[in-house]
Amino acid sequence: MGFADDFYYGQCKVVAVTTASADNGKTVTITSSGGRTWSGTMASKKCEFMLPPRDKYTIALISGGVTQFSTDFFCGYGEYLEIEVGMNKNTALGIKNIVNAGLEADYFQVGDQITFKENGVDATYDVVEVAYRQGVYGHNVVFQRHACLNTTRQMNASNTNAGGYNSSLMKTYLDGEFFNSLESDLQDVITEYSYQGSVGSQSTNLQTEEHKVFLPVEYNIFGATSYAAGTERTTGGAEQWSYYATSANRVKAANGASCVWWLSSPYVSDSATFCSVNTSGAATGDNASNSHGVAPCFMIAAD
């Protein structure tokens, strides 16, 4: 244990926890804003500290001299805190710890499935890429919902792709209502994903888009641009996600039945359509006001 040397009224109890047995024996340090440090060792998947209250601290998990996790927290008067510091691929905070340590390739394989909660209900997500464009995004894992949401949705209320995905009703929904439905720990670790997407209206011009939750561009799925602007690949740098190199993985279902599902790429040859994936897993496009399946994506990347 890492109890403080002195007694303070209203001490704050902090418990570093992990669900991974491999974290036992690793060192946990806590450093105050004034530079005082406490140290302990993970045992039985936890390490406890009693700290002076009303201060800001930094907690770190260290293995072999390498800091695998670090975060700041505030310790209130008489407060009890549990802080997850371990490498657990099945929890949002554990995944964040893994990518912060640069160990995503050791813990994840493309095709792994992880369960997250949406409005308190379990939903299965596929690992569609590990370390996607690492030179751009750093250490990361990309997740996409295995099945589409139960409710199909329009990309826009009318048949237009003007402004691209960034101006769509779908974007507003996914970054708003849907994001807010995710468990709070997951919301806290999702990375704002920045990429170059088409502006629509039959243009090959691109715009920078930033989203917490997003849909893939056509190239992410097919490794080609059949109906999207080729600049999403040649200028924007999009790459195919490894999960979708297997064509069978491109077929998705909503409510147990295979469905057409939306992509974020505007259809480059007209102004009314967005790219999509048909029930056979092939590239296609549909009018923006049609209701189709939605398979949300997000990235968890290192700080």
Task: Tell me what each language-model feature is.
Residues 1, 8, 64-87, 214:
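Structured interaction patches on ligand/partner-binding surfaces of diverse proteins
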Residues 1-12, 59:
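Viral virion structural and adsorption modules
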Residues 9-27:
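Structural motif
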Residues 20, 34-36, 63-65:
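Solvent-exposed strand-loop boundary residues in beta-sheet-rich modules
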Residues 32-46:
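Short, acidic Ser/Thr/Gly-rich low-complexity loop/linker segments typical of extracellular
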Residues 46-58, 63, 77:
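Short Pro-Gly-centered beta-turn/loop motif in secreted/extracellular proteins
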Residues 84-303:
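Collagenous Gly-X-Y triple-helix signature in extracellular proteins
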